[in-house]
């Protein structure tokens, strides 16, 4: 109120705290709405010369969907069909598969190899190329990739939130003039924003200045994905609880995501470190964008729609979820359609819900619900229904400036994947 407006020179501790809280409220949520692509796609190899390849913000044409064999096998030739026998051989293979214009090849080779070793995953050309393709798509092999127009996006989001929460402009302007821990004012730092790592650091500095802010405001950090593979920070935090991190214990998992080594490790884990029945790598690319098992679940939704006659969103989410990740009480459209088939499936409501709760695991494929639904779908349509389907999701975020979908993303990465396999053939 009036006290805040009078605070132009020396502020009391309480007034400073209120100013900072006002600033945190307006910054929280900026650019973090939607966890998908945070920058325009890096150009494909055939769209740019070598000298231009380091400009990931350039607009790129969508390639035609690449041809794939029925089982998604890599092209025949000199690529090793079995894992390489040693880390030394793996490094040689990774260097061979990286695009020619990648800078710091040795560092990228080392971090990719160490991630596979730490995750105890066999290093085949197909798996290595999957990781290389995602890195190329998400960051153009920049460990801290720039987001074109990030400062402008943040200012727009700040203004929207200022109006939403009724914060007087004079109060916000005063808060922005405060000197931050790095010696610059918060206004100057926002004007200079170029990367998500910088945005993350700004928010962390803000929250650290509010008494108890690190604990109180941690869940409101607007940056939810980051690093060269744009991996989810929530996923990274869960990963270190399940498996030992291969490097020295970091000050924070969040900060480690923004490093090359951490971003590569967590990204490869998200992409490849889970069992799936997919015959083609493109469905892992779709899952990387939409969530694990989304391609399998979208196919399940398609089969369910055929049997029930209901029009369903093929988004790969079978249930509704709360912010904490637990299933919501409100039934999803997929759940309602499934319940409408109780008698035909010979399953009760409790059994159906029990099976649907396994949608984020491989075990879902062995449930009575999954097996009986597909038996119905196959017999009803007279053909074997697909068991995997790229989810149909429109990607939305303040950072996205043109229509993008999960299908676009998956085909884009698949094209890079095929290019990588061809490099191994040459």
Regions found by a protein language model. Give the residues of each.
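Bacterial N-terminal signal peptides that target proteins for export
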Residues: 3-20
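Cell-wall glycan-active module
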Residues: 7, 29-426
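Bacterial N-terminal signal peptides
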Residues: 18-28
């Amino acid at each position: 109120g009036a006290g805040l407006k009078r605070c132009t020179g020396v502020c009391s501790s309480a007034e400073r705290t209120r100013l900072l809280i006002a600033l945190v409220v307006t910054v929280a949520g900026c650019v973090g709405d939607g966890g998908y692509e945070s920058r325009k796609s890096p150009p494909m190899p055939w769209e740019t010369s070598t000298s231009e390849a380091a400009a990931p913000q350039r607009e790129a044409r969508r390639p035609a969907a690449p041809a794939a064999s029925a089982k998604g096998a890599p092209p025949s030739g000199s690529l090793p069909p079995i894992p390489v026998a040693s880390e030394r051989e793996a490094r040689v293979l990774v260097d061979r598969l990286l695009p020619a214009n990648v800078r710091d090849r040795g560092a990228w080779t080392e971090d990719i190899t160490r991630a596979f070793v730490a995750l105890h995953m066999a290093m085949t050309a197909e798996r290595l190329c999957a990781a290389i393709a995602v890195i190329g798509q998400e960051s153009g092999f920049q460990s801290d990739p720039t987001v074109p127009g990030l400062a402008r996006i943040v200012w727009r989001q700040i203004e929207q939130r200022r109006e939403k929460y009724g914060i007087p402009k004079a109060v916000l302007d005063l808060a922005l003039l405060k000197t931050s821990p790095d010696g610059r004012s918060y206004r100057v730092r926002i004007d200079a924003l170029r990367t998500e790592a910088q945005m993350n650091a700004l928010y962390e500095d803000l929250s650290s200045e509010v008494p108890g802010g690190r604990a109180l405001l941690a869940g409101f950090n607007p940056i939810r994905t980051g690093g060269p593979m744009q991996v989810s920070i929530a996923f990274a935090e869960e990963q270190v609880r399940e498996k030992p991190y291969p490097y020295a214990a970091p000050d924070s998992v969040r900060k480690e995501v923004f490093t090359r080594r951490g971003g590569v490790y967590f990204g490869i884990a998200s992409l490849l470190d889970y069992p799936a029945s997919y015959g083609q790598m493109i469905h892992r690319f779709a899952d990387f964008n939409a969530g694990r098992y989304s391609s399998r679940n979208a196919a399940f939704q398609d089969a369910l729609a055929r049997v029930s006659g209901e029009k369903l969103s093929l988004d790969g989410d079978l249930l509704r979820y709360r912010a904490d990740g637990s299933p919501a009480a409100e039934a999803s459209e997929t759940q309602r359609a499934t319940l409408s088939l109780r008698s035909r499936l010979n399953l009760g409501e409790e059994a159906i819900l029990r099976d649907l709760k396994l949608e984020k695991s491989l075990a879902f494929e062995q449930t009575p619900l999954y097996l009986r639904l597909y038996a119905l779908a196959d017999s009803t349509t007279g053909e074997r229904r697909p068991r995997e389907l790229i989810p149909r999701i429109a990607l939305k975020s303040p950072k996205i400036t043109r229509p993008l979908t999960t299908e676009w993303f998956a085909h884009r990465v698949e094209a890079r994947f095929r290019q990588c396999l061809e490099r191994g053939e040459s």
